[in-house]
Amino acid sequence: DSGMGSEHEVIFSSLSLSKNKSFTDILEIGTFDGFNSLLLSNLFPNSNIDTIDLSETDDDFVNFYNRKDNINKFIQDRNIILSKNKNINFFPLNSLKLLNYKKKYDLIWIDGAHGYPLVCIDIINSLHILKENGLILCDDVYIGTPKSQDKTYSSIATFETISVLEKEKLINFHLIYKRLDPLNNCDPKKRKFIAVLNKNFF
């Protein structure tokens, strides 16, 4: 076991078995290679899975994850995966434009850029388009300052944002270990969580 499995897969699997919640419309922010979209579509076969990522011509999309030299193959492989199930809808969209979205979602998975200001904006926008009793999950949450911070991969931004929102009683959140192996958890600066949050509707 490499320790690189993520507990978000277990969380999604558990939610798919829930008798108390219905997840008709699901939004994924950050498509990446499409495998998580495929997982969601298999776990929630009767749901609509909307997944968004930057346009393939966007400089950040091209340069993230060192994929610049293999960008065409990356896109081709991703699109093949996304085409496997009919309930997956891919949109090349900068998540900032969710500000103008009208559609509401039961479940939102935030896995785009992890630093300021983008993840903060993603969280606020997601709260605006969340249905009552809906859930938002955020990936790669550091609760202490990571060894290095950047706007894309590693940042304390998610934790700081949701902590302020909870302090004002706008949301409630819980943290779940992202990985369970000792290597990823013994060093607090490497330890990551998945945040599960719900909005307090007044």
Placement of each model-derived feature along the sequence:
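A short alpha-helical cap/connector motif
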Residues: 1-109, 113-202
